[in-house]
Amino acid sequence: MNFKGYSDYRHDTVARIGVLVASLGTPEAPTASAVRRFLASFLSDPRVVELPRPLWWLILHGIILRIRPSPVARLYQSIWREDGSPLLSFARRVGQSLQAELDSRGRSIEIRLGMRHGSPSIETALEELRQSGAQRLLVFPLYPQYSGSTTGSTFDAVAQVLSTWRWVPELRMIAQYHDHSGYLEALAETIRRSWKEAGRGERLLISFHGLPKRYLLAGDPYHCQCQKTARLLAERLGLKEGEWQIAFQSRFGREEWLKPYADHLLQAWAEAGIKRVDVVCPGFAVDCLETLEEMAQRNRELFLHAGGEEYRYIPALNDESAHIRALTDLVEQHIQGWSEADLGGGREATGQAAERSRQRALALGAKQ
């Protein structure tokens, strides 16, 4: 096997810290063919669907990829923006804002965005970090609550890429940040602002992406971390019991998923006489199909049709300044102990040390 190395390595290269900001991914276009490619990649991940591979291959290729791409493409068409996929657009802005915030704090750190499925890929992002001289790598999946199907899958993808490298970097990963104070306060700020601008509903629905219940029973901590996030957020907002409720959305298939289901709960509230609700989705760092179409559009129609009168979706944190500060704090927390090009005497001193290293290497026969 040919491993990727530094055939043109310069011995005055300053080791840098690289941060891979990772997200799930998105189709490249709101078309059936693009959605088919995305679903084929996403649903082939054994972390996402834990079924025997031969059986699942038959279901996926014999049924799902034949009937689902067209209707899912229509859903994407309802939220597609001039600059493309909302998830990709917002994730890029998060990456750019995170880079700017780190720069403003005097950090010499390279940020790259990589998608688990689709483009820009994790492999491409890691290669760009390698070419920039990143010898210390922090993997930052934008999933506040850990699940094997998301964060675990990201680690698998990173490990697969690094297995092809000759010089593997030092590696760390932010596995979850569901109870981080900056993250919780950023969420609380967006909700308070919504209440101030448009009034407060009778109930706050705190909705997370669902998972099959058997994943919880198998030891996945996702459900517990969602519960903790919701409880801590409600406490920050001063909400009493009965003024808020956690729920889980986006289920597919026939098996039991985490409950209560968001659509069932919203319908029950409307039928019970609840007229005004606010909805927030703390598990989504950026807005995407599941928030903009499912929660902001489809479940709004369900609630109003069942007798509700006001339904307000509160957007994801996206590139809100409080969110970016929280993410930057997390990066700084997790790189403690790693030196940077602007530490240990500053950039000039570091550059001088690198040049001395190069001169010693040249004396030993190095090319550059």
UniProtKB/Swiss-Prot annotation:
Family named by the database record: Belongs to the ferrochelatase family.
Biological pathway: Porphyrin-containing compound metabolism; protoheme biosynthesis; protoheme from protoporphyrin-IX: step 1/1
Record field: catalytic activity: heme b + 2 H(+) = protoporphyrin IX + Fe(2+)
Gene Ontology BP annotations: heme biosynthetic process
Enzyme class of the recorded protein, top EC level: lyase
One GO MF term attached to the UniProt entry: ferrochelatase activity
Protein name: Ferrochelatase
Entry EC no(s): 4.98.1.1
Encoding gene per record: hemH
GO cellular component: cytoplasm
Source species, domain of life: Bacteria
